[in-house]
Amino acid sequence: MSHLVATEYKCFEDIRRTRSDGSEYWYARELASVLDYAKWENFAKVIKRAMIACENSGHDVSADFPEVRKIVEAGAATKGIVDYELSRYACYLIVQNGDPRKEVIALGQTYFAIQTYRQEVADRFNQLDEDSRRLVVRGDIKQWNQLLAEAA
């Protein structure tokens, strides 16, 4: 997996951003480019489907898909455009609703599924009290020691 993160998944890591509170997000327009969507209108349709899935799963759409306005230069003038600061879950839903014919969509599905699972495991671990955490770590160390003993 670490080799995959370093190569195939690098495009998703490169556009990931982190807020001051440590939460991660991706700009929708940058994600659209990585997912090979040339037209924003086509990607916006995918975002809308992902928002519906988000709402139907009981999540707060405004928390996972917060809309932001950006100012861009268009020749001599400037104009405001809509973008989104997508949560990891929002990105996961987007790649699940993306064009399945695109290879990068399959990579995105795998990347965001793995990252979402990792975050869920970390969140569950962090909710444990100190004694329970110690037991989990102790069990992990026991398994790794058994693997080392078998390899020796």
PLM ranges: what are they?
Residues 1-45, 63-152:
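Positively charged, aromatic-accented nucleic-acid-binding surfaces
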Residues 50-62:
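Short, basic alpha-helical nucleic acid-contact segments in DNA-binding proteins
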